[in-house]
From Swiss-Prot:
<feature type="binding site">
    <location>
        <position position="305"/>
    </location>
    <ligand>
        <name>ATP 1</name>
    </ligand>
</feature>
<feature type="domain" description="MGS-like">
    <location>
        <begin position="955"/>
        <end position="1100"/>
    </location>
</feature>
<feature type="binding site">
    <location>
        <position position="247"/>
    </location>
    <ligand>
        <name>ATP 1</name>
    </ligand>
</feature>
<feature type="binding site">
    <location>
        <position position="291"/>
    </location>
    <ligand>
        <name>Mn(2+) 1</name>
    </ligand>
</feature>
<feature type="binding site">
    <location>
        <position position="718"/>
    </location>
    <ligand>
        <name>ATP 2</name>
    </ligand>
</feature>
<keyword id="KW-0547">Nucleotide-binding</keyword>
<feature type="binding site">
    <location>
        <position position="789"/>
    </location>
    <ligand>
        <name>ATP 2</name>
    </ligand>
</feature>
<keyword id="KW-0677">Repeat</keyword>
<dbReference type="GO" id="GO:0044205">
    <property type="term" value="P:'de novo' UMP biosynthetic process"/>
</dbReference>
<feature type="binding site">
    <location>
        <position position="129"/>
    </location>
    <ligand>
        <name>ATP 1</name>
    </ligand>
</feature>
<keyword id="KW-0479">Metal-binding</keyword>
<feature type="domain" description="ATP-grasp 1">
    <location>
        <begin position="137"/>
        <end position="334"/>
    </location>
</feature>
<feature type="region of interest" description="Carboxyphosphate synthetic domain">
    <location>
        <begin position="1"/>
        <end position="408"/>
    </location>
</feature>
<feature type="binding site">
    <location>
        <position position="832"/>
    </location>
    <ligand>
        <name>Mn(2+) 3</name>
    </ligand>
</feature>
<feature type="binding site">
    <location>
        <position position="844"/>
    </location>
    <ligand>
        <name>Mg(2+) 3</name>
    </ligand>
</feature>
<dbReference type="GO" id="GO:0006526">
    <property type="term" value="P:L-arginine biosynthetic process"/>
</dbReference>
<feature type="binding site">
    <location>
        <position position="305"/>
    </location>
    <ligand>
        <name>Mg(2+) 2</name>
    </ligand>
</feature>
Length: 1102
């Protein structure tokens, strides 16, 4: 039955900023869906607050709204655009919850908008834990299989305590309703833990409801991805097995597809139950994902939960099988059936054929505990990983070792040298699931543990344990052999060993192993992902490496450009870099090159099989990239490799690639060194006559102390060659400096520590620019709202700048040009400046695409990444202006006076992390980056744009109520004006004694409240922390004091996180918030699409 004719326009809701549990996979699914719907001739309206996504590019939808995803704003868009239908299943939990509220408050009915892709009843049956239990019971009556864990629904703490007795005691699982990524869930082993976890769960659940369940810790966990159309055709797209047993959130687990340890009969049972559930719930046009637990002792099957939408697992399943779930879900939503949709990859089989795999896929999660030293690293049912890598191999060991190597983290690959340690101690360590458990298991095996002991400690299935033993046996063979023979190398490679691992075991250099391997002719071949186990020919070149017989890479005539992606998402290197890689691929395709993408992140648009001409799903290590370059050179001419778009990962490979004779295009490895190495960069600045803050490099504490004494404290210390401010700290005195040097283990003459003067009270400025060797194109100038010293990735910023004048822009332009020329950039460069008093200091330069490129491109309506890719391959700025890729006149520094103002705000993952005692982690911003994503607010005035950015990131700013203020002495003077404004807007102020005193002297009334350290008052007056916990505070302003006195502040800020109260930690943020509150109180806040903003900017240029 072909598509419906009664729908002309569709509103698609995106997933907003990247947070833990809801990441780039929704950009991938949303982009696919928008393209499909547009190709079907529908008008597509999109709302998504995240500018770093491909889906918010103006060409993907017909009208793109970068606005907060809240029922209020989405209603404004519906009123303006009047769509016929709303598709909410592609934007994760955010989109689903928003659609449910719009349905509930009558907005959809009022404007005559139909929900497609999922009906409200099906969403509720899948999401509401009580209704879902009934569904599972129905299924069991019909087919005799499948049950739910015994459970108890609670709406208050009294219910919760009763529930434990009803379930027969601890441990119990706590799960809140309608949350995502396991937010607020956990295992409680005693009453203290129960009160803490359930209290937070009741707060986080929009329906104040939590479910207590019997514990099924240690059971095997599986997932099925299914799709169903309105004619009741159902396909099982993929089965996924979790390597880690129940108790670890599936997003934090190593997962394997297809499932490895199910018997045929067990698999059929899961299939039957899954198909019966999707029918019973009533998902009739789209995909869903169902999670199961199987008791290894008696085979009892429990259905854990389902997601009636496109999820993180569906992105993984799509990449693992080549079956594009999101694309097909969008087609089903507008009326097609599965048998009418062709399979893109074979082009001769329909989508109703279930994919079959002749390879194994392994996904491994990437964590960021090093960014939150106080956080508890135990893995639980609350998701904590920030990214993932996927690898494909011909067997489990090969895919598994490739996945670990793809994580690009020190110590992520198995190591087989040195003493493993004490067996019993290692087994004890392996009992607690953490990000490094798998390495502890391998060391325990090396120390002589038996398979039974490993299983008892970890409950990892015996089949997987055997595979780990197999990997260790191969390592022993390499260690015992006298020489590297062709047979030995082939065997090691077939089990996923890297040259680096083989080199370490045999005591040789990595390059020596590679030379021997090439001399013996042991090289990988590349196989195609074809959805059908080679039964039909694949038309899309989507490759993975294997040490097999024949290669499937076809020869070509056109010159190829190889683009290195950014690998797994992590804090500091996220989807923004993927955005630049995808744009480069599009631009170079248009310019007549064959584009080749290399990446291993399954969540992204870059690893979609139709983004580039060829896709290699491979780790981004030197060995893997060199083999791909070799394979492509055999196939046809290679114009070069682009390393400057994928962030720090490919940048770090540039010199080694060049040394191996690979043509690196764009900014040369030498130029990268000139910007990254402080000594070399100092010389560039000196030649251009530009001031940098006083600094020096040190390799010992003595040297560091001498520099700090000469510069004066506070100083900023950091290692060289890092991204995301890794390991940076502002040091206020000598004792802390000594401790910092002692903790930084990796100091060496080639990797010194940098000591810079820290500029207090400076305005930080970020510039993105293009340089072709002759001419500079200033992409955009962003003025940070927070002061210098807070990592630029965590700071909010405004473009065009709000307090800089024409003279400042002139100076910035001249300095940027001087640096770009001195370093030798060809393409993009990002420079951070600090304006202190009247002096413009250069903080650092990055000779690559920065994380602000997508934001700058959207704010100025110019595709910077596309232009950069062309410049890398020799185009000039003048040529690109003539072609129309860049504006004919002017640039991002000459925007019209009435240009819209865009504000970027960073989104932090504080709420996901707890320390071992269950307290939150501190929310103070510093020089080390901790945000996972970003949102953008755009409007004609700064106040409204800032208010939108806050609404998109943390929920709307309060417009009345009680505000608590407590600031450090250095901030007291600058706090008076914004505080007075708050009172004028009708806020009631509360403050600690010191701050209240200053306010009173300035004629501002504030109620004095007790600090946490003072305890409850004699007449039971609550402390500020108790007031926050009781929901009596609407806005918190708390700036930290130097290094001491942080503890009171810490308690206040962690309480704010636990209760989701807006908490501002700088006076600058307070001043911006006041402008935002003012805008909200005064005016009707409107919405405009990016296309309308762009039309305005383009008209202003002519």
């Amino acid at each position: 039955m072909p598509k419906r004719t009664d729908i002309q326009s569709v509103l698609v809701i995106g997933s907003g900023p990247i947070v833990i549990g809801q990441a780039a996979e929704f950009d991938y699914s949303g982009t696919q869906a928008c393209r499909v719907l547009k190709a079907e001739g529908l008008r597509v309206v999109l709302v998504n607050s995240n500018p770093a996504t491909i889906m918010t590019d103006p060409e993907i939808a017909d009208a793109t709204y970068v606005e907060p995803i809240t029922p209020e704003f989405v209603e404004k868009i519906i009123a303006k655009e009047r769509p016929d239908a709303l598709l909410p299943t592609l934007g994760g939990q955010t989109a689903l919850n928003t659609a449910i509220s719009l349905h509930g408050n009558g907005v959809l009915e009022k404007y005559g908008v139909e929900l497609i892709g999922a009906n409200v009843e099906a969403i509720n049956k899948g999401e509401d834990r009580d209704l879902f239990k009934e569904v599972v019971e129905e299924v069991r009556k019909k087919i005799g299989h499948g049950e739910s864990a015994r459970s108890y629904i609670c709406h208050s703490m009294d219910d919760v305590l009763k529930g434990v007795d009803a379930l027969g005691g601890y441990p119990v699982v706590v799960r809140p309703s309608f949350t995502m990524g396991g937010a607020g869930s956990g295992f409680a082993h005693d009453e203290d833990e129960l009160r803490r976890i359930a209290g937070q769960g009741l707060t986080l659940s929009p329906t104040t409801e939590v479910l207590l369940e019997e514990s099924i810790l240690g059971w095997k966990e599986y997932e099925l991805e299914l799709m169903r159309d309105k004619n009741d055709n159902v396909v099982v797209v993929c089965s996924i097995e979790n390597f880690d047993p129940m108790g670890v959130h599936t997003g934090d687990s190593i997962t394997v597809a297809p499932a490895m340890t199910l018997t045929d009969r067990e698999y059929q049972t899961l299939r039957d139950v899954g198909i019966a559930i999707i029918r019973e719930v009533g998902v009739d046009t789209g995909g869903c994902n169902i999670q199961f637990a199987v008791n290894p002792e008696d085979g009892r099957v429990i259905v854990i939960e389902m997601n009636p939408r496109v999820s993180r697992s569906s992105a993984l399943a799509s990449k693992a099988t080549g079956f594009p779930i999101a694309k097909i879900a969008a087609k089903l939503a507008v009326g097609y059936t599965l048998d009418e949709i062709p399979n893109d990859i074979t082009q001769e089989t329909p989508a109703s054929f279930e994919p079959t795999l002749d390879y194994v896929v392994v996904k491994a999660p990437r964590f960021a505990f090093e960014k939150f030293p106080s956080a508890d690293s135990t893995l639980t049912t609350t998701m904590k990983s920030v990214g993932e890598a996927m690898a494909i191999g011909r067997n489990f060991t090969e895919a598994f070792q490739k996945a670990l190597r793809s994580l690009e983290k020190k110590g992520s690959q198995f190591t087989f040298v040195g003493e493993p340690g004490d067996k019993d101690e290692l087994l004890r360590e392996a009992v607690r699931p953490t990000d490094g458990r798998i390495n502890a298991v391998m060391q325990a095996i090396r120390a002589g543990a038996t398979p039974e002991e490993v299983f008892d400690a970890t409950k990892i299935d015996p089949w997987f344990v055997d595979q780990l033993f197999l990997i260790k046996e191969i390592a022993d063979e390499i260690a015992e052999s006298r020489e590297l023979t062709a047979d030995l190398l082939t065997e090691a490679k077939r089990h996923g060993f890297s040259d680096q691992q083989i080199a370490e075991i045999s005591g040789l250099g990595e390059d020596v192993v590679r030379q021997v391997r090439h001399a013996l002719g042991v090289r990988p071949v590349y196989k195609t992902v074809d959805t059908c186990a080679a039964e039909f020919a694949a038309r899309t070149p989507y490759f993975y490496s294997s040490y097999d017989e024949e290669s499937e890479v076809a020869p070509r005539e056109k010159p190829a450009v190889i683009i290195l992606g950014s690998g797994p998402n992590r804090i500091g290197q996220g989807i923004e870099f993927d955005y630049s890689c995808v744009h480069a691929s599009f631009a170079l395709s248009d310019a007549g090159y064959e584009t080749v993408m290399v990446n291993c992140n399954p969540e992204t648009v870059s690893t979609d099989y139709d983004t580039s001409d060829r896709l290699y799903f491979e780790p981004l290590t030197l060995e893997d990239v060199l083999e791909i370059v070799h394979a492509e050179q055999q196939a046809g001419p290679v114009a070069g490799v682009i390393v400057q778009l994928g962030g720090q990962t490919p940048l770090g490979l540039s010199q080694a690639l060049k040394d191996n004779g690979v043509p690196v295009v764009g900014t040369s490895p030498e130029a990268i060194h000139a910007a990254e190495d402080r000594g070399a960069f100092g010389r560039v600045l000196a030649e251009a006559g530009l001031p940098a803050p006083k600094h020096g490099t040190a390799t010992t504490f003595g040297e560091a102390k001498a520099i700090a004494d000469e510069i004066g404290y506070p100083v900023l210390v950091r290692p060289s060659y890092v991204l995301g401010g890794r390991g940076m700290e502002i040091v206020y005195d000598e004792t802390r400096l000594e401790a910092y040097i002692a903790e930084s283990t990796e100091i060496s003459p080639s990797r010194p520590v940098l000591v810079d003067r820290f500029l207090d009270d400076a305005i930080e400025i970020d510039v993105d620019a293009l340089y072709d060797g002759e001419e500079l194109y200033l992409g955009g100038v962003m003025e940070h709202i927070e002061e210098a010293g807070i990592h630029s990735g965590d700071s909010a910023c405004a473009l065009p700048p709000i307090t800089l004048g024409g003279f400042d822009i002139k100076r910035l332009r001249a300095s940027t040009e001087g640096i770009a020329k001195g370093v030798g950039v060809r393409g993009l460069i990002n420079i951070q400046f600090a304006l202190a008093g009247d002096i413009l200091y250069v903080l650092e330069a990055n000779p690559r695409a920065s994380r602000t490129v997508p934001f700058t491109s959207k704010a100025t309506a110019v595709p910077l990444a596309k232009a950069a890719a062309r410049i890398s391959l020799g185009a000039t700025i003048a040529e690109l202006r003539a072609e129309g890729l860049l504006p004919a006149l002017g640039d991002g520094g000459t925007l019209p006076l009435d240009a819209p103002i865009s504000v970027k705000e960073a989104v932090m993952p504080w709420s996901r992390f707890r320390d071992i005692h269950g307290r939150g982690v501190d929310t103070v911003l510093g020089p080390e980056m901790r945000s996972t994503g970003e949102v953008m607010g755009i409007d004609s005035v700064f106040g409204t744009a800032y208010a939108k950015s806050q609404a998109g990131a943390y929920g709307p700013l309060p417009t009345k109520g009680r505000a608590f203020i407590s600031v450090a002495n250095r901030d007291k003077r600058s706090m008076i004006f914004p505080a007075r404004e708050l009172v004028a807007h009708g806020f009631e102020l509360m403050a600690t004694s010191g701050t209240a005193e200053v306010l009173k002297r300035n004629g501002i009334n504030a109620t004095v409240v007790r600090k946490q350290s003072e305890g409850t008052g004699p007449n039971g007056e609550k402390t500020i922390v108790q007031l926050i916990h009781d929901g009596e505070v609407d806005l918190i302003v708390n700036t930290p004091y130097g290094t001491s006195g942080r503890l009171d502040g810490y308690d206040i800020r962690t309480a704010a996180v636990a209760r989701s109260v807006p908490c501002l930690t700088t006076v600058q943020a307070l001043a911006a918030a006041v402008q935002g509150i003012d805008a909200l109180n005064h005016g009707d806040v409107g919405v405009r699409s990016l296309q309308e903003h762009a039309a305005f900017l383009i008209a202003a240029r002519d």
